Structures are given as structure tokens and as C-alpha cells.
From Swiss-Prot:
Chemical reaction(s) catalysed: L-citrulline + L-aspartate + ATP = 2-(N(omega)-L-arginino)succinate + AMP + diphosphate + H(+)
Protein family according to the UniProt entry: Belongs to the argininosuccinate synthase family. Type 1 subfamily.
Keyword annotations: Amino-acid biosynthesis, Arginine biosynthesis, ATP-binding, Cytoplasm, Ligase, Nucleotide-binding
GO annotations of cellular component type: cytoplasm
E.C. number(s) listed in UniProt: 6.3.4.5
Subcellular location: Cytoplasm
Protein name per its UniProtKB record: Argininosuccinate synthase
Pathway per the UniProt entry: Amino-acid biosynthesis; L-arginine biosynthesis; L-arginine from L-ornithine and carbamoyl phosphate: step 2/3
Molecular function, one GO term: argininosuccinate synthase activity
Binding site for L-citrulline: Y96, S101, N132, R136, S185, S194, E270, Y282
């Protein structure tokens, strides 16, 4: 077929490429709409699974890319993004551990690095115009490479459905294994997998068993609990069941241990950055165990005011990460605050895994502020309970004065 090539001045584009239907169609579309430009496919390996990477280079080249760069980011992703975020206590809207959100800044950073390496003058992503990811990616691009043009095909082209994309590729004799019958939209990395679409678009529908792919149904999980030990240094998991592991290996080990117990499933309706609500089902087995372990150590080592400050840091971090503001001064400051608080977050936790639950049942720390001698409900010789009387009188002084003033007003 005869295709008119538009003149836009773009010479070389680095595309965030997954090998899926969308990005497979984007490659020829870019050539047709951006000066027959050179397309460099870039894929970030953030632990989505080896099966997702098999044949990826061949597929990209067959679609029209001149190169395909697959960059292994797994260890960096866990060490530099997941661990600091978990240590901060960040959890979006009280439930979501930010698995997708945390992956976007490292992917964007690596994409920019590839663009610099190959001398590209534009970046491209396959995010839709309805979702959060377009904002996350482009926010990171703005912070890291404000000089590079950003192309977002879903905001430009007229295609609206999988059927449109399949027809587009067929017209150009580009083969794809994708079909029009895909039910769910999924996004996976080392930390979690998300599921959207299909029956989940109606919040009155219970997720079918076919939604979940990583964890066992808690109803079918073992009837006997499993206990896992985690050792923590400065807010980082360093050992699992006594074995020293790298951050990535620790996460993979905990995923393998916790998933058969159905740990880490959530079904939420969240507030998207772009204003609408969306429903998603998430599976985060290992991350849920890590989160529980760190919070358990914090209960031992953080005093009341420090714990209050950590909660404020966590709330702000959750929104910054969700909103794609990783590369901002505020995020840097909050990470520094979290790092400071984590200096005393050291110790060992035993987490009980049973029927979808991860519960910290044992914890100890060399920095523990808990004293059995002071906290005991039995007879003790170290705490004079009479001392509490003066504290209570001072603590409640403002309330006492307010009440006295109110009585004076009534009596006049």
C-alpha cells in the first residue's frame, strides 16, 4: 500500500517497547508520521519474567525498529526504588503498595540514558491518554531530558481499539501473536502484577479466579501456616530465613514463599492522577511480607514523635510516587528523612503466612525502646505509678482551663 510520510523534523526516536500489540503498532506508525525516522526499541527488564523477553529483539526488528536495547534493571529497581519506598512506609490510599508506580521512574531514566547513548532527538511511550502512566513518564522525561521531544501516539492517532491496531498491522503485513480477545490489561514486575479491564470494570463484579495469576486463592492455600524470618538493617531486608541475599534475590525468595499462601492480593478502586477512578486487582506477595516486617520493627524502635513524622513522610511519599514525581526536590528530601529514621530500624521479624494474611508474630531489635520492666502489668519495682499523676495534670491543663472558663461564662 502507498503511505504518505509526514515531515516533522524528528530523526531518531527511542520507544519504550514491550512487544505487545500497542508498541508493535507504534513502530510503523512513527515511521509514517515522523519523517520515516529511525526507531530504537528499548525494553526495561524490571523482573516482568523471562518469557516476556524471549524473541523481543526479533519482534522489534520485524516491526521496523533498527535496534532493540534490553536493559537489565532488576537489581537497581529493587535496591534503589522499591527498598527506599517501602522503608518510607508509603502506601497509596491505605492499600496500594505502588508496584506499578515505582517502576516508572527507573524505566524513564533508563530510556533517557539509551536516548543519549544513541543520539536520539525524541522519546516515545505507549501509554493511553486516560491513564496515570503518561503523566509519570512525561514528568520524568521533563526532569531528566527537557530538550527531547516526547511523542504519545495514543493522544495522536485515530485508532481506538485492539481491532483497529490488528487491522493496522495486517495492512502492513506485520505479524503479531496478539488477538482481539484479550480480556485483561496486565502489568508485571519483580514487585507485583496488576490486572485491569474485563469484568473488573464493573465494581459490582467479584473478580473471577482467572484474574489472579501470581498468588494462590487464600481459600485453597495450605491449612498449615508457614513462618518466615527476615533480618533488617537500616530499614532494608538483608536476610531471609538466615540467608544473606541481594535485594532482588530477597524479593524473589519472598515472592516464592508467600504466593502459595495467597498473600498480597488486593482489589481496589483508586483515584487516578488524571481525575477518574479506576478499579484494579494487584498481587504483591513478597512486598507485603517486607512491608509487614519493617512496620513491626518500627513499632519497637521509633518513639511517638518519630512515628508521627514517619507517617507524614509516608503519606507524602505515597502521593509523590503515585503521581510520578520521583525526580523532584521534595521526593529527594522525603527520601533523606526516611533514610534518617531508618537508621534505628534494625532487627529480626518472624512473619506468619496463612490464608492470605502476613502477620508479624515475633520481633526484636537492638534498638528497641520497649522495656518489659517498665511495660509489665505485673508487680514491678522500676516504675512508680504515682508519678503519672503530675504528668496527667499538666497534660490535661488546657482542657481544665477551657472547662473552667466555660463555667465562668455560664455563671455570669
Amino acid at each position: 500500500m502507498s503511505i504518505e510520510i509526514k515531515n516533522t523534523g524528528v530523526k531518531k526516536v527511542v520507544l519504550a517497547y514491550s512487544g505487545g500489540l500497542d508498541t508493535s503498532a507504534i513502530i510503523p506508525w512513527l515511521k509514517e508520521n515522523y519523517d520515516n525516522c529511525e526507531i530504537i526499541a528499548f525494553c526495561a527488564d524490571v523482573g516482568q519474567g523471562e518469557e516476556e523477553l524471549v524473541g523481543l529483539t526479533e519482534k522489534a526488528l520485524a516491526s521496523g525498529a533498527s535496534e532493540c536495547h534490553i536493559v537489565d534493571l532488576k537489581e537497581e529497581f529493587v535496591k534503589e526504588y522499591i527498598y527506599p519506598t517501602i522503608a518510607s512506609g508509603a502506601i497509596y490510599e491505605g492499600t496500594y503498595l505502588l508496584g506499578t508506580s515505582m517502576a516508572r521512574p527507573i524505566i524513564a531514566k533508563a530510556q533517557v540514558e539509551v536516548a543519549r547513548k544513541v543520539g536520539a532527538d525524541a522519546l516515545c511511550h505507549g501509554c493511553t491518554g486516560k491513564g496515570n502512566d503518561q503523566v509519570r513518564f512525561e514528568g520524568c522525561f521533563a526532569a531528566l531530558a527537557p530538550d527531547l521531544k516526547v511523542i504519545a501516539p495514543w493522544r495522536e492517532w485515530t485508532m481506538q481499539s485492539r481491532e483497529d491496531l490488528l487491522a493496522y498491522l495486517a495492512e502492513r503485513d506485520i505479524k503479531t501473536s496478539a488477538s482481539a480477545t484479550k480480556i485483561y490489561s496486565r502489568d508485571a514486575n519483580a514487585f507485583h502484577i496488576s490486572h485491569e479491564g474485563g469484568e473488573l470494570e464493573d465494581p459490582w463484579n467479584e473478580p473471577s479466579k482467572g484474574v489472579w495469576t501470581l498468588t494462590a486463592d487464600p481459600e485453597d492455600a495450605p491449612n498449615k501456616p508457614e513462618y518466615v524470618s527476615l533480618e533488617v538493617e537500616h530499614g532494608r531486608i538483608t536476610k531471609v530465613n538466615g540467608e544473606a541475599l541481594t535485594p532482588y534475590a530477597a524479593l524473589m525468595t519472598l515472592n516464592a514463599i508467600a504466593a502459595p499462601h495467597g498473600v498480597g492480593r488486593i482489589d481496589i478502586t483508586e483515584n487516578r492522577l488524571v481525575g477518574m477512578k479506576s478499579r484494579g486487582c494487584y498481587e504483591t506477595p513478597g512486598g507485603t511480607v517486607m512491608f509487614a516486617a519493617l512496620r513491626a520493627i518500627e513499632e519497637l524502635v521509633l518513639d511517638k514523635t518519630s512515628r508521627n513524622w514517619r507517617e507524614q513522610v509516608a503519606a507524602q511519599m505515597a502521593h509523590l510516587v503515585y503521581d510520578g514525581r520521583w525526580f523532584t526536590p521534595l521526593c529527594k528530601s522525603l527520601l533523606a528523612a526516611s533514610e534518617s529514621l531508618a537508621e534505628s530500624v534494625n532487627g529480626e521479624v518472624v512473619v506468619k503466612l496463612y490464608k492470605g494474611q502476613a502477620t508479624a508474630v515475633k520481633k526484636r531489635s537492638p534498638n528497641s525502646l520497649y522495656s518489659e520492666a517498665f511495660a509489665t502489668f505485673g508487680e514491678d519495682q522500676v516504675y512508680d505509678q504515682k508519678h503519672a499523676e503530675g504528668f496527667i495534670r499538666l497534660y490535661s491543663l488546657a482542657s481544665r482551663i477551657r472547662a473552667l472558663n466555660a463555667n465562668d461564662v455560664k455563671s455570669k
